[in-house]
């Protein structure tokens, strides 16, 4: 990220994993000044993520909030 920032190159984080990786990308991205976007599979927000966690992803004007709460802000379902 620092090398990209030095040369004015935007950085993109890529996540096609689960809610833990998504939360980690959001927290990391919040601290990268040259972040362009976090790429993810939006269909997972309503299908895959609710099976594994209680995390609710709310897209607002193309933006995602950084999860809050202890740790990364993700609570896994024990039944998953």
What are these regions (language model features)?
Residues 1-70:
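Shared catalytic-loop signature of beta/alpha-barrel
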Residues 76:
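Charged, cofactor-coupling segments
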Residues 79-80:
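Intrinsic disorder at enzyme termini
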């Amino acid at each position: 990220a620092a090398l990209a920032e030095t040369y004015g190159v935007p950085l993109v984080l890529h996540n096609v994993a689960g809610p833990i990786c998504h939360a980690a990308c959001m927290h990391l991205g919040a601290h990268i000044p040259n972040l362009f976007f976090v790429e993810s599979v939006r269909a997972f927000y309503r299908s895959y993520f609710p099976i594994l966690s209680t995390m609710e992803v709310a897209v607002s004007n193309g933006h995602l909030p950084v999860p809050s709460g202890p740790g990364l802000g993700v609570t896994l379902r024990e039944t998953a």
